[in-house]
Amino acid sequence: MDTIDIKLLKLLQRNSDLPLTEISRRIGISTTPCWNRIKKLEERGIIKNKVSVLDRVKAGFPVTVFLSITVSNHNSDWYTKFEEAVVKHGQIMEVHRLTGSSADYLLKIIAKSIEDYDVFQQKLIAEIQF
């Protein structure tokens, strides 16, 4: 990747809906080379998806909670259940594996309210058995 690719990626990360003519103008190259670069970045897997970033407050989820999880049983059966639960619940936005702390995982969860989060947390605990 060169500096043009890096500029292109930074721009697309901010707004991938820009018309190709606007992208190429901002990057400083003509449209055909710009389109070719985007396609190459997609083919190489550097650009994986083009997504819409939602305003979670306007979507009805104004509360963000970070849940630390400490696991007592590190086996593949537990991890499979954990992975299935994470994928199933749309309120879980991110999952991070931690090292160097007492927690094993950190989950970023969105909710409609603290009460909604409390209900969700109890349901998650019952499902996964930490």
Label for each model-derived stretch:
Residues 1-130:
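A compositional/biophysical signature of low hydrophobicity enriched in polar/charged and small residues
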